[in-house]
Amino acid sequence: MAYPFQLGLQDATSPIMEELTNFHDHTLMIVFLISSLVLYIISSMLATKMTHTSTMDAQSMETIWTILPAVILVLIALPSLRILYMMDEINNPVLTVKTMGHQWYWSYEYTDYEDLCFDSYMVPTNDLKPGELRLLEVDNRVVLPMELPIRMLISSEDVLHSWAVPSLGLKTDAIPGRLNQATVSSNRPGLFYGQCSEICGSNHSFMPIVLEMVPLKFFENWSASMI
């Protein structure tokens, strides 16, 4: 989860987020190596008085600085495309949850259960209990089973929203009249926080998302108590 003064990514809790974290490190290393090379070349040019004023053409150099960037782009593109296809895959979900964005709250419907739906509003700061997080707590959490593929159908009732949970590697736009989908899967139990990530009006900052991932038997008990 997130913590104060955090500079890096949140701890990965899903296979997709683990892949995204590895890809981030992979790309950042390439950027670091390129930046180091450019800095070395600039430093060398400034430190020497030697120049090549008579050089009119250097085909070998032109070949190198054409092919090398192309190879680097391929090394970035291939893992990126792999992750994009992984994020679009939804294989045999055990549960489907429909998520609707509103100004300024979320509503959830468990389509596999009859009459299991609720709205999720942010808990005002004055009503928070000790230890709860400001602007991130909700009155109704989304309870889901861990270690199982879950399909989220995401749309909006009014304006553009975006349903995002960083530690699970999720960010899907909620568009009026359009149904987007995403796969939710967690490697471990716990509370995972997110927020609306698309400017949607004056209370955009007050649309938190809380997923409570629990073992399957606890989810079955919860769903039975809600119906």
UniProtKB/Swiss-Prot annotation:
Q: Which residue ranges does the entry give as Mitochondrial intermembrane-facing topology?
A: 1-14, 88-227
Query: Which coenzymes or cofactors are required?
Result: Cu cation
Q: What does the entry give for GO biological process?
A: ATP synthesis coupled electron transport
The top EC class is translocase
Sequence positions that bind Cu cation A2: C196, E198, C200, H204
User: What's the protein's topology in the membrane?
Assistant: Multi-pass membrane protein
Compartment(s) where it occurs, according to its Swiss-Prot or TrEMBL record:
Mitochondrion inner membrane
Residues the record lists as binding Cu cation A1: H161, C196, C200, M207
Chief localization class? Answer: mitochondrion
Q: Which UniProt keywords apply?
A: Copper, Electron transport, Magnesium, Membrane, Metal-binding, Mitochondrion, Mitochondrion inner membrane, Respiratory chain, Translocase, Transmembrane, Transmembrane helix, Transport
Where do the annotations place Mg(2+) binding?
A: E198
- The enzyme's E.C. designation: 7.1.1.9
**PROSITE patterns, from UniProt?**
COX2 (PS00078), COX2_CUA (PS50857), COX2_TM (PS50999)
Q: Name one GO cellular component term.
A: respiratory chain complex IV
Q: Does the record bear Iron-sulfur in its keywords?
A: no
Matches recorded under InterPro entries: CcO_II, CcO_II-like_C, CcO_II_C, Copper_CuA, Cupredoxin, Cyt_c_oxidase_su2, Cyt_c_oxidase_su2_TM_dom, Cyt_c_oxidase_su2_TM_sf
Per the record, the domain of life is Eukaryota
The regions listed as transmembrane in this protein's record are: 15-45, 60-87
Role of this protein:
Component of the cytochrome c oxidase, the last enzyme in the mitochondrial electron transport chain which drives oxidative phosphorylation. The respiratory chain contains 3 multisubunit complexes succinate dehydrogenase (complex II, CII), ubiquinol-cytochrome c oxidoreductase (cytochrome b-c1 complex, complex III, CIII) and cytochrome c oxidase (complex IV, CIV), that cooperate to transfer electrons derived from NADH and succinate to molecular oxygen, creating an electrochemical gradient over the inner membrane that drives transmembrane transport and the ATP synthase.
Q: Which family does it belong to?
A: Belongs to the cytochrome c oxidase subunit 2 family.
Protein name listed in UniProt = Cytochrome c oxidase subunit 2
Its gene?
A: MT-CO2
